[in-house]
């Protein structure tokens, strides 16, 4: 019996493979795949529904329609398996072979494959070195191409029109050969000698000098070398045989009523066959050339449409005027094979339903409706029923289940016990979007979800749905339980904060319970323990918020760590606290002191509390604690009965007067404008400023009034306490609402924006409590609608960004423990404008030290290199005031094809060092993409008053210490004895007693220094002041002013101030005035000494020249005596172009796409001395002379702000012209560390503005992937071409090989690729093709004969293997090790056998993979 069953089963052993190769198929290969030629365009007989013979669905070619049954019905049943029927020619076998058997069409005339012709850059064009336009003219029979010029003056590959051709034939007879159509192109391809071409190209490359030629040759060389290496012949790009897809993959299904639904491919194939057959007939009839030619062209077009419809010319359309879906359309795009079927499979054993809240569940549970569970666990129930003998067959078991008999429910309970299910809420933006829970059976039809996991799922209960999936195998259940159980995922992988933080009601309840009130009932009582407090509270002797004294028992860690000693010991102390806090102390986990609860618990505090619990008490205690906090919070919020009413929105009493004052000021500005004292723009700016200040003032007054309330204390005196106003409590606790929203309810709504983003100058002075009038309502509708439109856009954009990020990092997995590198980056606290934006502890927490951390006072090593810096370590480092720590980073990790655990550091979602096999790339992408929807979509316009901060005009110290200047700080002392700064990049540091940097401030050019280097100062001391509205030009030398090229009406114009009547000279742009001679001149000042000689720069022969840029107001006169540090001219800063600052999501995308900004700042290419050369039209010439004396020139537009001056020494990579930085320049001139710092800081700025926390390491991981390719500078003896971009690990492998063979390794430059570019240029063609530009990627891969080693996650998902991450990584490693040992054993046995027989050992054949 068993043998018979096995006959039925015939399980196909699936192949085990480690790589997939793609290549061009030769005509013979196509024929070898085929099971017969399709000769007729017929599909099926419309009466009998049987396939036509030799047609597109022919059973003889493709196999039988019914299992084990031939077409005519002569042979049926299994016993005839493998017989070929002599009547109908059909093999008796399974019908599913119709999914895998291919046919072919012999083309009467060769046809070019459109992918290799039209997919840019055209591969055919590259190989033939002809333009695409010319090849197309030949292929579509518009022109001839010379194949063999013979003895004529014609050139090979020359294109000629028909007329030309006939003339030449008359002239030369048959001395030469020219052809048209694909035959001609095929001849040309066959005639190419690849090896020879490669040699010539390599020599050409060495000898040519022109950039364009180098580029062209390198491109062509790459394609030809690919052909050479892969053994693919170029003429295979021209098809002689067309393969036909198996019929089940292009089905034809009869609908009722005699109509048929068919795949578009059948139409396309029919066209090809019809035209092919017609062409065959015409050729047999020896029809006139012109007719045959037309038919060949039509055949070419038909094949084009089949392969890629619409790529050339108009798309072929079906009966309904809709373009037909070709083979290319089947695989590309969102609905194509890759993204729809290979990456997005639907799964069995799943269901979805609405979610409702389940406050009684434990954190690791979810409520599963009985009916759903019954359906999901059906097979398990069937099995149990059979085992228990309730049902004899599966059919009987099925009946039992359908009737839902009582025994079924008991069995369901049993089956479900300890069997986790996975819940998923779409969109799954990060790994916490799928978590495992233990199901609890419930009545009803909705899934119950624990409230604390809502934050991770981003779920709410307004109708959200969730999907349930059942892990089937034991391994899957185990992984779900250990890795995915909700109680094991309590931290966000993005930043390491707890994800199970209470919100809304829970927060409100806990806040209310831990507030204190003055003179509450029972204030000042003392209690002996918490149980007494609870009794008093239940008997209404005390209120929740009353201040009382209580003896509280805390469990503290035992000092005695000996064997058998308890871990925690009780400690009793008296606390002054409130009733609510004392009651809450009951749920404190052992190891946490009561002090963490002895304060009003706001949302931030609760988050910190859970974090502390996790670090001090471990995962288990924390989960229990969080659950209990939630229960208490809900209970207390219910008991508190907090509600809001209109009267809670207190409108501030001062509102009328504040608004009235503002209106008066606005009137005053209107008057000034009417009398012409201010411009329209100034008036508008001022009005907007006034109203935004007013809005703030009203809001402040409102919050002051709302936040406190009068109360009588125990002594009978009136005092104020924090308010118990419901609205204030909600906002203050962080449960709901914010100051801004309360301001709209009870203050004033303030200014509104127009559709284009500009601000309407009349504000809405009303608030929602008073109500809006029609105009106010109308003004505010715009903002509301724009918000909705923005949200929709944002979601799509954010999703696309996430997709690109995942694609670029998907193959980055932790593959080893330590790569052993000593490199790292120096981490400092992030300081902006003297404020610490991000403390050092946050930046190094969870990283591995790259060098020893040394105590600056005692010089002893605190932490050795290679130590993981945890909370205690960073606290030590902070306490000792160490201000810089070198840590390992993903950027400098030397692991190839992955990362090592030490360079990555702590896995933030688990709180310990990352495990080998963790897919850190995907986690990084999710962490950056997930908050994307919270970012704004807007571009900020600076100018107008949108978000103008007051312009800074001084800096002051924030802490006590000593002033220190950086090396680049230079200043001169002027006649008044003031120190004037003349450096552009000088900074002042404040250091503490041991000399550690506490803060750092940029001091701009032209500032007056109030404190000098080494001065001891107190916090709040001003360090420097400057005029914020103008930028001065200052002389560093004294002397007599001598103007050069200052001609009124040519380079300067006289401006007379309307109000004061004084005149000043303004430098104007020369090109506005006609005189040609004045083009190269630039107004400047030279200084003369007492003898009338030009003052020289000390130590050189250069005369001092101080140039004025366009727009400068010259404040000195010709011949005037000036002192050192005196101002020669001022440039009003208002006249500088207002820069748009790209914010939000577009900015993040711009950084990761590594786009060069327009008007980028210019960085110095070398270290050297600056001088100014001769100006050209509209440009100024800046020259840097390096230390060897070579000159490097930069041409800079006149209106740009140059940050350096004559004679200044600049360092390589220093900014010399103002503007946004170009990341490519930073990488080239300052290196990887500077680049990473730039991208990390810029991305963090955007997220920080929205209050989103992301750990730096995620951004570093992305930057590592952006840097994964290098450009070859000198190829040494390697197989690369200079200028080629290759994968870094490839190049390092190749260089290792060269060094081992004593050959010259290649040298290279780092290059930065944007994430889209990096994803497409990955080594894996499967991953690239499934990302974007599918056709182009596949075309290129096919020509190169590329091999995909299946290293990344995506490729493995697509081919259906376990992914090489997590447990899958271990699986693949073990499998490879086993294969290796099998191979060695096989060799050993073969050798032993050979030895025994005493024969000379024959070479052992390579074993095929042993069936596993």
Curated annotation (Swiss-Prot):
Primary gene name: rpoC
Function in brief: DNA-dependent RNA polymerase catalyzes the transcription of DNA into RNA using the four ribonucleoside triphosphates as substrates.
Organism: Burkholderia mallei (strain NCTC 10247)
Annotated GO biological process: DNA-templated transcription
Protein name in UniProt: DNA-directed RNA polymerase subunit beta'
Enzyme class label: transferase
Keyword hit for Nucleotidyltransferase: yes
Taxon lineage: Bacteria, Pseudomonadati, Pseudomonadota, Betaproteobacteria, Burkholderiales
Quaternary structure annotation from Swiss-Prot or TrEMBL: The RNAP catalytic core consists of 2 alpha, 1 beta, 1 beta' and 1 omega subunit. When a sigma factor is associated with the core the holoenzyme is formed, which can initiate transcription.
Family: Belongs to the RNA polymerase beta' chain family.
GO terms of molecular function: DNA binding; DNA-directed RNA polymerase activity; magnesium ion binding; zinc ion binding
């Amino acid at each position: 019996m068993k043998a018979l069953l096995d006959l039925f089963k015939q399980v196909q052993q699936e192949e085990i493979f480690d790589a997939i190769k793609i290549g061009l198929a030769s005509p013979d290969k196509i024929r070898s795949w085929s099971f017969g030629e399709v000769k007729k365009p017929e599909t099926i007989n419309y009466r009998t529904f049987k396939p036509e013979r030799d047609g597109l669905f022919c059973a003889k070619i493709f196999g039988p329609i019914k299992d084990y049954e031939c077409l005519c019905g002569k042979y049926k049943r299994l016993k005839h398996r493998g017989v070929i029927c002599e009547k109908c020619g059909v093999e008796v076998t399974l019908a599913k072979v119709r999914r895998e058997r291919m046919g072919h069409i012999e083309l009467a005339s060769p046809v070019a494959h459109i992918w290799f012709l039209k997919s840019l850059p055209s591969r055919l064009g590259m190989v033939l070195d002809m333009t695409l336009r010319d090849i197309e003219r030949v292929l579509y029979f518009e022109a001839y191409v010379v194949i063999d010029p013979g003895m004529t003056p014609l050139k090979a590959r020359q294109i000629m029109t028909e007329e030309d051709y006939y003339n030449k034939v008359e002239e030369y007879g048959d001395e030469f050969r020219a052809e048209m159509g694909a035959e001609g192109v095929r001849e040309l391809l066959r005639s190419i000698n690849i090896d020879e071409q490669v040699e010539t190209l390599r020599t050409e490359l060495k000898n040519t000098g022109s950039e364009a030629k180098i580029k062209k040759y390198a491109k062509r060389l790459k394609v030809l070398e690919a052909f050479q290496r892969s053994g693919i012949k170029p003429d295979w790009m021209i098809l002689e045989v067309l393969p036909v897809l198996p019929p089940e993959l292009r089905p034809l299904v009869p609908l009722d009523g005699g109509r048929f639904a068919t795949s578009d491919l059948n139409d396309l194939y029919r066209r090809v066959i019809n035209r092919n057959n017609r062409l065959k007939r015409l050729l047999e009839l020896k029809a006139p050339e012109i007719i045959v030619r037309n038919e060949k062209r039509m055949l070419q077009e038909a094949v084009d449409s089949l392969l890629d419809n619409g790529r050339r010319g108009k798309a072929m359309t079906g009966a309904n005027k809709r373009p037909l879906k070709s083979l290319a359309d089947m695989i590309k795009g969102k609905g194509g094979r890759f993204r729809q079927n290979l990456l997005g499979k639907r799964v069995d054993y799943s269901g979805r339903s609405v979610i409702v809240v389940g406050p009684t569940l434990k954190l690791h549970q979810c409520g599963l409706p009985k009916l759903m569970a019954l359906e999901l666990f059906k097979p398990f129930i069937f099995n149990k029923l059979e085992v228990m003998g309730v049902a004899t067959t599966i059919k009987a078991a099925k009946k039992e289940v359908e009737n839902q008999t009582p025994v079924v429910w008991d069995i369901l309970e049993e089956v479900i016990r300890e069997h986790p299910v996975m819940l998923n809420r779409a969109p799954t933006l990060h790994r916490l979007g799928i978590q495992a829970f233990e199901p609890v059976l419930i009545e009803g039809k909705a899934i119950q979800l624990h409230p604390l996991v809502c934050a991770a799922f981003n779920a709410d209960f307004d109708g959200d749905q969730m999907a349930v999936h059942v892990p089937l195998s034991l391994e899957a259940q185990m992984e779900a339980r250990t890795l995915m159980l909700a109680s094991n995922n309590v931290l966000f992988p993005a930043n390491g904060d707890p994800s199970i933080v209470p919100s809304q009601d829970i927060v409100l309840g806990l806040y209310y319970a831990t507030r204190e009130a003055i003179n509450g009932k029972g204030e000042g009582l003392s209690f002996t323990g918490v149980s007494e407090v609870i009794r008093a509270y239940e008997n209404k002797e005390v209120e929740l918020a009353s201040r009382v004294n209580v003896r509280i028992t805390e469990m503290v860690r035992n000092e005695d760590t000996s064997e058998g000693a308890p871990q925690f010991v009780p400690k009793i102390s008296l606390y002054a606290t409130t009733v609510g806090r004392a009651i809450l102390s009951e749920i404190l986990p052992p190891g946490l002191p009561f002090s963490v609860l002895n304060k009003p618990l706001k949302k931030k505090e609760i988050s910190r509390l859970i974090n502390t619990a996790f670090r001090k008490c471990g995962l288990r205690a924390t989960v229990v604690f969080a659950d209990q906090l939630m229960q208490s919070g809900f209970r207390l919020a219910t008991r508190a009965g907090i509600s809001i009413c209109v009267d809670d929105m207190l409108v501030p009493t001062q509102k009328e007067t504040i608004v009235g004052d503002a209106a008066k000021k606005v009137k005053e500005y209107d008057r000034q404008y009417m009398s012409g004292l201010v411009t329209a723009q100034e008036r508008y700016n001022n009005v907007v400023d006034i109203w935004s200040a007013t809005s703030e003032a009203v809001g402040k007054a409102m919050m002051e009034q709302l936040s406190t309330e009068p109360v009588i204390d125990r002594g009978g005196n009136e005092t104020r306490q924090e308010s118990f106003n419901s609205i204030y409590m909600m906002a203050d606790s962080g449960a709901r609402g914010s100051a801004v929203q309360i301001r709209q309810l009870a203050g004033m709504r303030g200014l509104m924006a127009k559709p284009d983003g500009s601000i309407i100058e009349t504000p809405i002075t009303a608030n929602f409590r008073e109500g809006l009038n029609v105009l106010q309502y109308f003004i505010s509708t715009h903002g509301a609608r724009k918000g909705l439109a923005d949200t929709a856009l944002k979601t799509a954009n954010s999703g696309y960004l996430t997709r690109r990020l995942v694609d670029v990092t998907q193959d980055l997995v932790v593959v080893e423990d330590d790569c052993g590198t000593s490199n790292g980056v120096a981490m400092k606290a992030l300081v902006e404008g003297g404020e610490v934006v991000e403390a050092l502890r946050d930046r190094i927490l969870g990283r591995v030290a790259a060098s020893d951390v040394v105590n600056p006072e005692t010089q002893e090593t605190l932490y050795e290199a290679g130590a993981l810096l945890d909370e205690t370590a960073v606290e030590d480092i902070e306490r000792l005031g160490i201000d810089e720590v070198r840590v390992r980073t993903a950027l400098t990790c030397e692991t190839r094809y992955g990362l090592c655990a030490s360079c990555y550091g702590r896995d933030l979602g688990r709180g310990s060092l990352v495990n080998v096999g963790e897919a850190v790339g995907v986690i990084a992408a999710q962490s950056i993409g997930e908050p994307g929807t919270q970012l704004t979509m807007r571009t900020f316009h600076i100018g107008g008053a949108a978000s103008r901060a007051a312009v800074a005009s001084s800096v002051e110290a924030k802490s006590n210490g000593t002033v220190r200047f950086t090396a680049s700080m230079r200043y001169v002392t002027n006649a008044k004895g003031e120190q004037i700064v003349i450096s552009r990049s000088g900074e002042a540091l404040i250091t503490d007693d041991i000399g550690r940097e506490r803060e750092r401030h940029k001091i701009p050019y032209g500032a007056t220094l109030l404190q000098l280097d080494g001065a001891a100062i107190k916090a709040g001391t001003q360090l420097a002041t400057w005029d914020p509205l103008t930028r001065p030009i200052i002389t560093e030398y004294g002397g007599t002013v001598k103007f050069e090229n200052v001609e009124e009406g040519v380079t300067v114009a006289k401006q007379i101030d309307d109000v004061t009547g004084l005149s000043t000279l303004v430098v104007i742009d020369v090109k506005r005035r006609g005189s040609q001679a004045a083009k190269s001149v630039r107004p400047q000042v030279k200084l003369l000494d007492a003898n009338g000689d030009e003052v020289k720069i000390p130590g050189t022969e250069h005369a001092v020249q101080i140039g004025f840029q366009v727009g400068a107001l010259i404040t000195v006169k010709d011949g005037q005596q000036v002192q050192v540090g005196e101002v020669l001219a001022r440039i009003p800063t208002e006249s500088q172009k207002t820069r748009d600052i790209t914010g939000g999501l577009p900015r993040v995308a711009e950084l990761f796409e590594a786009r060069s900004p327009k008007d980028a700042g210019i960085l110095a290419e070398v270290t050297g001395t600056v001088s100014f050369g001769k100006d050209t039209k509209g440009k100024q010439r800046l020259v840097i002379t390096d230390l060897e004396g070579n000159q490097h020139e930069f041409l800079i537009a006149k209106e740009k702000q140059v940050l350096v001056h004559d004679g200044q020494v600049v360092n390589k990579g220093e900014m010399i012209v103002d503007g946004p930085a170009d990341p490519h320049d930073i990488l080239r001139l300052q290196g990887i560390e500077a680049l990473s710092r730039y991208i990390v800081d810029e991305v963090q700025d955007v997220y920080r503005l929205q209050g989103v926390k992301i750990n730096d390491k995620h951004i570093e991981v992305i930057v590592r992937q952006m840097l994964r390719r290098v450009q070859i500078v000198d190829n040494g003896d390697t197989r690369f071409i200079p200028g080629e971009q290759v994968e870094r690990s490839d190049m390092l492998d190749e260089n290792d090989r060269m060094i081992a063979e004593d050959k010259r390794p290649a040298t290279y430059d780092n290059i930065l690729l944007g994430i889209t570019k990096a994803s497409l240029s990955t080594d894996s063609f499967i991953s690239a093709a499934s990302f974007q530009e599918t056709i182009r990627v596949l075309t290129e891969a096919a020509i190169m004969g590329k091999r995909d080693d299946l290293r990344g996650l995506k490729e493995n998902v697509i081919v259906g293997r376990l992914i090489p991450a997590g447990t899958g990584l271990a699986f693949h490693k073990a499998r490879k090790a086993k294969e290796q040992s099998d191979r060695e054993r096989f060799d050993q046995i073969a050798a032993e056998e050979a030895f025994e027989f005493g024969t000379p050992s024959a070479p052992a054949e390579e074993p095929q993979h042993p069936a596993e």
